[in-house]
Amino acid sequence: MTAVHAGNINFKWDPKSLEIRTLAVERLLEPLVTQVTTLVNTNSKGPSNKKRGRSKKAHVLAASVEQATENFLEKGDKIAKESQFLKEELVAAVEDVRKQGDLMKAAAGEFADDPCSSVKRGNMVRAARALLSAVTRLLILADMADVYKLLVQLKVVEDGILKLRNAGNEQDLGIQYKALKPEVDKLNIMAAKRQQELKDVGHRDQMAAARGILQKNVPILYTASQACLQHPDVAAYKANRDLIYKQLQQAVTGISNAAQATASDDASQHQGGGGGELAYALNNFDKQIIVDPLSFSEERFRPSLEERLESIISGAALMADSSCTRDDRRERIVAECNAVRQALQDLLSEYMGNAGRKERSDALNSAIDKMTKKTRDLRRQLRKAVMDHVSDSFLETNVPLLVLIEAAKNGNEKEVKEYAQVFREHANKLIEVANLACSISNNEEGVKLVRMSASQLEALCPQVINAALALAAKPQSKLAQENMDLFKEQWEKQVRVLTDAVDDITSIDDFLAVSENHILEDVNKCVIALQEKDVDGLDRTAGAIRGRAARVIHVVTSEMDNYEPGVYTEKVLEATKLLSNTVMPRFTEQVEAAVEALSSDPAQPMDENEFIDASRLVYDGIRDIRKAVLMIRTPEELDDSDFETEDFDVRSRTSVQTEDDQLIAGQSARAIMAQLPQEQKAKIAEQVASFQEEKSKLDAEVSKWDDSGNDIIVLAKQMCMIMMEMTDFTRGKGPLKNTSDVISAAKKIAEAGSRMDKLGRTIADHCPDSACKQDLLAYLQRIALYCHQLNICSKVKAEVQNLGGELVVSGVDSAMSLIQAAKNLMNAVVQTVKASYVASTKYQKSQGMASLNLPAVSWKMKAPEKKPLVKREKQDETQTKIKRASQKKHVNPVQALSEFKAMDSI
């Protein structure tokens, strides 16, 4: 390798290297290579028994090679004469091509006269190789001459940047900036052309990133230098100018290295390659676990697989221990890590049992499937953990900046330094979360863009802080304010680029699932803050809810831009509009009313139910958006947590599910009920459908509340479960087999009803509102009545009689009475739960819970237990295909970074 330092230009070129680094050289060389190869391969089958003679085809091919060589010589002469750089080398290369062309012409002619001669063929092959080498060297030299021209322009820009930085007065600064702008534009055009021709993707990305930094920072350097000249006593301006100058120097080096296709010294350029580390490790592990039993060796494979897995688990543990990871998510990650460990041991045991066999046994295949399922489950938990971080960190990203600027405008340098630390921590958190998202992503191009964006954000952070410090030193200076506004705009733009890049490598399904959970957490916090009269906590948490909702709307709307307009996009956008135009304004109104009521002295009364309903609608709105987005997903695309198989029979979410027994007449009462005639089954089904409506109301009511610390909800769920099992019995299903089982179940319901009655009466006795108290007592009386009815109806007599050779099943009337009694009881339980909540809230408002010695009844909101978000399509139903728009964005990984345009004026 030789380095030419003509005019201080660092030009690296190895004269012996024939490495082709650009697409242009390949395109120019390809026709000659094809012609020479065709000629060399003529009659390549060896000596022939046919009569020797002249080969017309070989002569034609030789002539075409000669003509192509002449064309290269003509162009080479022209390039050598016009080139300002490497003139001597180009002339020598042209002469070498001419010499090798003459040798090739002679060798090709001799071969064409005697194509069966192996000696003449060998001579021609050697001549062809020499000719191709000479032509390649000529093209590479011409290419390097273009590079040299670019480097000369780069040197002009580099010198101009230095002059701009060192300008002694504002007049000189203006002159230098005016002279530099067209030179930067000229360089950008040349670099863009070179970027398109580079073969290596990494070098293209490096060039694009460097161009983006150059275009963006030259105007900022002008502003920073101007501020230095006007306020030489403010150290922050000088620090900012030097930081920007350093970035520009790095950009110049990046363009130089990329143009010459040489390795970069900047480590940050190397980290962009490839997908995430954890994702790669998991993918590689999944490949490594599939081994031919014949070649399996425990000594070789066990240590290797265990070591790989422990490395993966170490990475997962780091993510689990991160500050933003929720406790429940941490526990799930730990559980999945243990499950993966166990699955690997089971798999290795199966491999040991299959060692030496030609084919894998079913047990081994099952162990492999289990292993891949466990790694898939671990992946899912890691993705959700990442989304926890993204959802929390990329929320209200401009708040730390606005607080910092406000302190700077007030001229309070002490506060600025304090808020600068908060801002720095916020920036570091964004970068950390972005890198976490990269670690679990398989999107190589997306990961590259995220890392480059994060790197630029990291470089921008100290510049923003310096701008704030400078403004704090001179708060009345118009230039200081303009300088701050410039950096504020740059920061917000870079955060948007990073946010979009992170969104691109994360799943919208994961984002919506996590956002739904976080909204629920915040809604509960809001309700608690309201009940505890915590005005600041209420206002802060409500702000987080608004921010999360706005982020969901933005992400989903952006995602819909990738689809052709249709029914799917209409449904999704309709759900987002409902949330943004109706639900959120109502929620904001309720929050403002609550804050105003609690802030007044004395505190004004507040309708908690209205507030809870408004909060609940926000959660429901987010959930509806998620359902709409998942509408086109196939079951295979959905996680287990997103999709549950919907059985033909509607069953309770709290009931125990059992497989149907073999239904043999006379074996059990349940089996007999299953043999009812279709007409009677239809009657029972009609009653069951009516019961299901009441059950769904109870499900909806109890699903609102967290049952930990709420005995009423626990009892309601228990009663619902038992009643569902009793109705299942009437259809020949469920865990209850005989009449005695049904009677026992009825007794359990009566016991639960008695406990609910006792608890409800305790609440009623302490309720200050007489109307609420009377309502609750009335519903409790209904529970006692319907429990008694259910106890009577539980003695279902199911018999099979043989009349005239036909089996006749009795017991339909008893079954229908049982279902009706269960339906009535279900309705009474629903009303009791509602009345208990209302009575509890009335009491809390009046006296406060602490002074009452009651069983723990905590009315805390809870997410509904999971329902199927998407119904399976029937096989015979036509499914509309949702096509991605033809204009779907396929953005070059660094295109966004290279599209910064220089400001026309400052």
Curated annotation (Swiss-Prot):
User: What happens after mutating S652A?
Assistant: Abolishes phosphorylation by CK1
Q: Does the keyword Ubl conjugation apply?
A: yes
Q: What name does UniProt use for this protein?
A: Catenin alpha-1
Which GO BP annotation is one of this protein's? neuroblast proliferation
Region entry Interaction with JUP and CTNNB1, spans: 97-148
Membrane topology (UniProt): Peripheral membrane protein
| Compositional bias ranges of the Basic and acidic residues kind | 864-880
Family, as annotated: Belongs to the vinculin/alpha-catenin family.
Asked whether the UniProt record includes Cytoplasm among its keywords, one would answer yes
What is the species of this protein? Homo sapiens
Modification type Phosphoserine: residues: S264, S268, S295, S297, S641, S652, S655, S851
Pfam families, per database record: Vinculin (PF01044)
